Amino acid sequence: MGGFPEATGNLLDAAAQEFHPTVCAPYPLQPLPQQLYCPHPYPAMPVPPPPQIAMLQPVPPMAMAMAPQPGYTLPTTTPVVNGPSSRVVVLGLVPPHAQEADVAQAMAPFGAIRSVDACAVASEGVATVHFFDIRAAELALTCVREQHMRQQSRLGQLYAAAAVAPAWAPAPTPQAWDWPHPNDDGRGLVLGHAVWAHFATGADDGDNRGSLVVLSPLPGVSVADLRQVFQAFGDLKDVRESAQRPSHKFVDFFDTRDAARALAELNGQELFGRRLVVEFTRPSGPGPRRRGYAPHQHRPTAPTPPRLQATWRPSQPTSSQPPASSSSSGSVRAREGVVLLRRSSCKSSAGSDQSSKGGNAGTSHERKTKGGKIVVAAAAASSSTPTASGKQTQKGVGSSGGGSWKGRKSGWEARFLFKEPEAGGGADTQATPASEMDTRTTVMIRNIPNKYSQKLLLNMLDNHCIQSNEWIVASGEEQPFSAYDFVYLPIDFNNKCNVGYGFVNLTSPEARVRLYKAFHKQPWEVYNSRKICQVTYARVQGLEALKEHFKNSKFPCDSDEYLPVAFSPARDGKELTDPVPIVGRSPAASSASSPPKSRAASVDRLGQELMPAPSSSADGASSTTTSTHAPSEHDEEEEEGDIRLAGELRRLGYDD
């Protein structure tokens, strides 16, 4: 055969025996440790394990295990956890099929649970548990870590002997097996699985973190006397004086429910010859809450995570300013629990509000248009128009010159704009005699999310009126209450969405000013909208003029929710007057002969005639078609629709 002359026969002998190496490796291959499933009660172990070997300190769950060494014993308790304690415990390595009820059932033996957030269990194996008592959270973390370390010890016992003992060494003498632990009752396991836990530092965000501060000076009252008063409401963690202000006393409760009960019972009560002023301790670190903090706004005593937070409305404001005008008063909420408007910071509002000033008057005149005769509110000349908040750059249609139409100008004549409030003052009514106050009451609310319904708009106005009227009662000022008697939210009947603006008639100029201060330049928080609410005067003013404007009009729709409505008596949130349509509606079938878009355009024109005239200083627009469909949720498309709308209004002659 070629290549090996001395070889005879076939080298690949089929009858040859299988080759076996004669030299073995000194250490066998070590299999990777696996997560054990430990149902409760624990099953009996059939085979005794190798000698007990444990690690010195607990190891986080995803860390690589070090080679165990013999001669060490397992600590009986988990070492003290470094870092501050919290009432929020984050669980890791949670079984992906676990539900919120399973996590709550596993953590319930440690103490009362405020809420459980298990939305990240399926994707990340993480669940968040909020306890009322910080002692319950500490106990839960200790037990969960003990269970995890006990399982790591068992894994070490299973695989350590193979890693340290040679193959020729004699078998070790069986020792006692700690399965199950004599004091183990299954606590700390989630569906029989050992998990890991750590505190969520900074996640216990809210007014009530179990800490109160007594602001009223109490001369001659010691910390021991104060402890005796507050400990009647629950166990105290600490009572101390402020290092910066010794007159302020801090009282820390273990349980947030005890702190809320103490605040409700003692705040404003006569004690030690003084009226107690008690508040929740503000956050000590920097952040938006630190910058925009306002004392004691009566928020929920036990705030839940954002996904689980319920609707809440204060029963009585205590601030010296209207809740809607306070930078930290929170957002206006609808009755169904929808967050409507998000308050912006004081600095940003003040910076944008001081950009300009405007003037207005209260006269009116009539004007002929293609749609008939309408009443137009006239005003004196004004100085300048404010810069609208929003994007500074965008794509424009029919724009002339650099910059954007919405970013540089407000787009409306100055006589339809509110006089911006100066620093520390109000709008329109600040230092203005009653005889010179603008008497207009009808406003236009712009940049409404297109999915907003008339019902949500009424809920928003009801909440605003309730808060404003409660502030008037609490402050003792003699002002007309906030109420409204007309609402119109134009709807595109093709897709059942609003067209981005609406009209409201208030019952007094003071109510109009309060609505402006509450809503103008505030972002919405519904439907993931990034629109900025804007409030201007409407072209047609007064309830009677609005009724005359819609006289003999019929809307081709099948629901009264799409019609302009009036309220008699006026609606103020507590007096929930039913809306009464001021126009008729024709069945959709009777108007089938006309194109849908033309019908929508005719109805939309009635709403456009209520709008203020666009400013002549705004960029020109060459568009000759009106967009009657609801704008897209994308900001650029919405802004392009506003540009086309302004151009169409100028084309129709509304440019004086």
Swiss-Prot record:
Skewed-composition ranges (Polar residues): 346-358
Compositionally biased intervals (Basic and acidic residues): 642-656
GO cellular component: nuclear speck
InterPro entries to which the protein is assigned, alphabetical: EAR1-like_RRM3, Mei2-like_Rrm_C, Nucleotide-bd_a/b_plait_sf, RBD_domain_sf, RRM_dom
Summary of the tissues where the protein is detected: Expressed below the shoot tip down the flanks of shoot apex in an alternating pattern. Not expressed in root tips, leaves or immature ears (female inflorescences).
GO molecular function terms attached to this record: RNA binding
Region: Disordered, residue numbers: 280-408, 576-656
Biased composition, class Basic residues, residue ranges: 288-299
Annotated keywords: Developmental protein, Repeat, RNA-binding
Compositionally biased spans, kind Low complexity: 314-331, 377-397, 585-601, 612-630
Keyword RNA-binding: yes
Pfam families named in the record: RRM_1, RRM_2
Domain RRM: 211-283
Disruption phenotype: Plants almost double the number of leaves, and plant height are reduced to about the half that of the wild-type. Internode number is increased and their elongation is significantly reduced. The terminal tassel (terminal male inflorescence) is replaced by an ear-like (female-like) inflorescence.
Protein function: Probable RNA-binding protein. Involved in the regulation of leaf initiation rate and shoot development. Seems to act more predominantly in the early stages of the leaf development, rather than in the later phase.
UniProt-recorded name of the protein: Protein terminal ear1
Natural source organism: Zea mays (Maize)
Source organism phylogeny: Eukaryota, Viridiplantae, Streptophyta, Embryophyta, Tracheophyta
Gene from which this protein is expressed: TE1
